[in-house]
Each structure stands twice: as C-alpha cells, then as structure tokens.
C-alpha cells in the first residue's frame, strides 16, 4: 500500500504544480518521478482522488484536485481563486432561487466550492457548464447570500 500512497501523493503534487490536460501527460510526468503504471491504474487513482477537469486561464481543460486535498500551487493564486476571480459573470435572485452565470466550464468547480462550505443561506447547488442554480434556505435574504458567496467568489459584489 505504501507504493500506492506514494503514487497518489505524486499525482496530487503534479496536478497541483503543473497544468496537466490528459492522462497521457500525467503518465509521462509520473514516469519522470519513477512511477510506472498503466492508464487503467491511473484512471482508478484519479477517480479515488476525486480529480476533475476545469478550464485554466488559457482556456485549456486541466486536472484539478478537490479543495480539501489541494496542495499549494506555484504562484500567488490557487487555481480555485483564479477560477473564481475570472469565471464569475453575474448573480440574480428569484424567490428562494439564485442563479450564477459563469464563463463556459467554470460552473461545476464553483458549485463544488459553494457546496463544500457550511452555509446558513444556501441548501445546495445544481451546476451545468456555465450556470449554477442555488436553492436558498427559508428566510435567506439576497444580501446574506451575496455576503456568503463573496467569501468564495471575491469579485461577486
């Protein structure tokens, strides 16, 4: 199991420090680190780590880790912060529903971050490619929701 744990740590470090867009690229990086594995094994590892793909700053889709296991990236901003700062377009309310519009490819990762924060205002989210529907708790005001979201999406105000 130690070999697998080391391999999973290597995968997390590579994904956290480089823009990797395919399993083939990741296999090459792992090979340079001394790990020899098949594409099927890598696929299982990525599933276990809950790795997803998200649009990078240059529009290329790259692997990203869920926030609870995110390693420090090289640079001033994490990928999550970059997504939040550059992917958000608008926020609108209607009754107990709010809708966030994003750039294409950004909604899923934003919804993931919203869902993984404790909130007195939001019950949950449903995300598409460029739209997030938020179901608000009874009595949640747009001001309170906007304040909560500003903790996750800095340029929402």
UniProtKB/Swiss-Prot annotation:
Keyword Repressor: yes
The keyword Cell inner membrane appears for this protein: no
Lineage top rank: taxon: Bacteria
Pathway as given in its UniProt record: Amino-acid biosynthesis; L-arginine biosynthesis [regulation]
Protein name: Arginine repressor
Coiled coil (UniProt feature): none
Functional description taken from the UniProt entry: Regulates arginine biosynthesis genes.
GO process annotations (BP): L-arginine biosynthetic process; protein complex oligomerization; regulation of arginine biosynthetic process
Stored Gene3D superfamilies: 3.30.1360.40, Winged helix-like DNA-binding domain superfamily/Winged helix DNA-binding domain
GO cellular component: a single term: cytoplasm
One MF annotation (Gene Ontology) recorded for this entry: arginine binding
Family according to the record: Belongs to the ArgR family.
Pfam families for the chain: Arg_repressor, Arg_repressor_C
Originating organism: Bacteroides fragilis (strain YCH46)
Intracellular or extracellular location(s): Cytoplasm
The entry's keywords: Amino-acid biosynthesis, Arginine biosynthesis, Cytoplasm, DNA-binding, Repressor, Transcription, Transcription regulation
InterPro entries listed in its UniProt record: Arg_repress, Arg_repress_C, Arg_repress_C_sf, Arg_repress_DNA-bd, WH-like_DNA-bd_sf, WH_DNA-bd_sf
């Amino acid at each position: 199991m130690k070999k697998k744990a080391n391999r999973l740590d290597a995968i997390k470090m590579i994904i956290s420090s480089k823009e990797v867009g395919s399993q083939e690229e990741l296999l090459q990086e792992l090979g340079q680190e001394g790990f020899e594995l098949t594409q099927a094994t890598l696929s299982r590892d990525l599933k276990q780590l809950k790795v997803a793909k998200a649009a990078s700053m240059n529009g290329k889709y790259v692997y990203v880790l869920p926030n609870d296991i995110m390693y420090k990236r090289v640079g001033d901003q994490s990928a999550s912060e970059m997504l939040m700062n550059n992917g958000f377009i608008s926020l609108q309310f209607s009754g107990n529903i709010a809708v966030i519009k994003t750039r294409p490819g950004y909604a899923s990762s934003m919804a993931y971050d919203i869902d993984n924060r404790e909130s007195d205002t939001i019950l949950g989210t449903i995300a598409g490619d460029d739209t997030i529907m938020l179901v608000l708790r009874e009595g949640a005001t747009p001001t309170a929701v906007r304040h909560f979201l500003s903790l996750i999406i800095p340029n929402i105000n």
